[in-house]
Every structure is written in structure tokens, then in C-alpha cells.
UniProtKB/Swiss-Prot annotation:
Top-rank taxon: Bacteria
Keyword DNA repair: yes
Protein name per its UniProtKB record: DNA repair protein RecO
SUPFAM superfamilies tied to this protein: ArfGap/RecO-like zinc finger, Nucleic acid-binding proteins
Keywords: DNA damage, DNA recombination, DNA repair
Function recorded in the entry: Involved in DNA repair and RecF pathway recombination.
Similarity annotation: Belongs to the RecO family.
GO cellular component term, pick one: bacterial nucleoid
Gene that this sequence comes from: recO
An annotated GO BP: DNA recombination
Amino acid sequence: MNIKDIGVIIAKKPLKENTFIITVFTKNHGLYSGVVKEFSKKSKFIYQEGNIIDFLWQARLHEHIGMAKCELIKSYTGYFITNKTKLYAFNSVISLIKELFHEREEHSKFFSFLINYLDNLSKHFCFRDYINFELALLAETGYKLDLTKCGVSHVTTDLIYVSPKSARALSYEVGKPYKDKLLMLPRFLLSDNSEITLEEKRQALALTNYFFNRYLFHNNRQVEARQTFIEYTLNNF
């Protein structure tokens, strides 16, 4: 059985000498893992995490892990390796995909979203883009937040809270009596022009973290690469 697709390498682990298992997030087939062999400097460069590749997967049966062959399309390593913020953001997003998506589950629209994010990240790091990535990931896994209008009154102004139950924004007037039980809605998520304060960064990460923990991170288990990104971001404002 053969699978041919374009993909992003999101994980690589050693199997034996010169042999590795790579996990690839493919455009049309979701996550696929395959065995690759490295016998040259060129092949070592091809199989780096974050590389966009032409991916060929071959196995006798679909349920087997299979062998993989890859041709490099684009490498992001040089853009990220010299910038800690970019590197930690990159490590976080690929670790989240690896953690939250199931093997061989198609996410073709999200694949395009990821490629666009990596292209933007290679140019510059934007905290707003990172949080929008996490929000998109929540939506892709079935937990979309509606931050466009108040979930009760339907007004589109003065939105400052998010309900942890409905995942909808709430206006100041509606949410005020229950503010101690609500999540804060960072202002920058409502306006592309606003400056992002340290407190708003904390609010944004607390917002996505709540829904990750409630629905997706089993037993409150955190993704280590994401925690590293959060700590670095909040401590280097």
C-alpha cells in the first residue's frame, strides 16, 4: 500500500543505528509515521522537524508503520534555530499537533493554516498569531470559542469575559455579576490595532489553557514544549 502526499515533519525518534521513526502531518491523510534511514549529511538535513517534504509511505498493510521516503521542499530550521522565541513557538505548535491529532485523521484545512503560520513565523514572531493558532487548534478539535458577540445579549461591544461553560464571549453588563467565575477576554483578540500588554498575554494563555485542560489534556497533563514557550514568553516581555 502506498500513500503519497505533502507534509510537515513534526517528530523524529531513533529506532536503531542510522534508522529513525518520523511522524509527518500530511495535507490529505493526517498524521503518518514511517521508518527512514540516514546515511548522509543530506538525509540528516531532510529529516529535521519542521521541514516541508514530499512524503511517500509504503507498507504491505495499512495498519503497519511502513517505510517512508522524503524529498525536501522547504526547511525552516535556519529561521528558528537562532531565535529562542521563534524556536519555542515552533516547538509548541508541532507538539500540540502531535498531542491532539489522531493518527491518519484528515485535517486538510488545518494543514494549510499551519503552513501559513510557519511562513509568518519564519519572518517574525507575533503573539497574536500564536494565540490565534491555539484558538484554531481548539476549533479543529471540536471546541471552538465564539468571541464575536455576547452569548446572552448578542451585543458586539464591551466584550470582556468568556464563559467557561459555553465558550462564548460575554459583555461587561452580562458578566459583571459572575465575574469571579468567568475567564477574561484579552482586548487584542478583538482588535488588530491594540498593543498587547503582559497582563493580556497572561489572560490569553489562561483562556486557551482552560479549554485545553478541560477537554483535551487528559489528567491535566501539560505539553512540555508549550510550557517552555509560555514561561519564556511571560518572563521575557
